[in-house]
Amino acid sequence: MRPSAPPSSMTSHGLLRRRAVALALVAAPALWLGARAQPAPGLRATPAQTEGPFYPVVFPEDSDYDLLRNGALNYPEGQGAWLEGSVSDLAGRPVAGAQVEIWQCDHSGHYHHPGEGARADRRFQGFGRVTVAADGRYRFRTIRPVPYSGRTPHIHVKVRQGARELLTTQVYVADDPGNPRDFLWRSLGAADRAALTVAFAPGGDGLRASFPIVVAA
């Protein structure tokens, strides 16, 4: 028969084992969360750009996803287009509940803004805001942006989460001849141009443009 270990030795080994298990249980979630927080391969934050001078001072009563319908008024000008995509963080997780805003000029190049007087077409909503779905998706119905003096076609985009502003940027039209002459588009590096320049391709119910947004949420 083997002699039993001294009681003090058994107690010491038992305490050490219990401590090791407890430490492992505490460390495991932290390690898992740390791994989850790491950027997904190939993901980089969407480049920021200036807000510009025409962010709305007064938001329209109708501020939904459809910029081609302002209240009871329909906007028949320009090329109808859908701008859609997703909002995710650097780990690729949807930023559910975030708000995406867009604003742009009408087909004649005028914004709904005091600096433009009353020249903007009141049938064009000009500004829209949507809340990102659980899967991170968002969608707007608008027009293909048009140029105006000094600027190539673009749409302004802002992303918020509660009181936090996560991103302000601009979206450009791929292959537009005005891009190389635009001072803001020219200021972008190759990777940033690729991230902010999207194709407006023909679809069944208008042009379609996909603009994925990645933020450091």
Could you say what each language-model-derived stretch is?
Residues R2-P29:
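N-terminal secretory signal peptides and thylakoid transit peptides that target proteins
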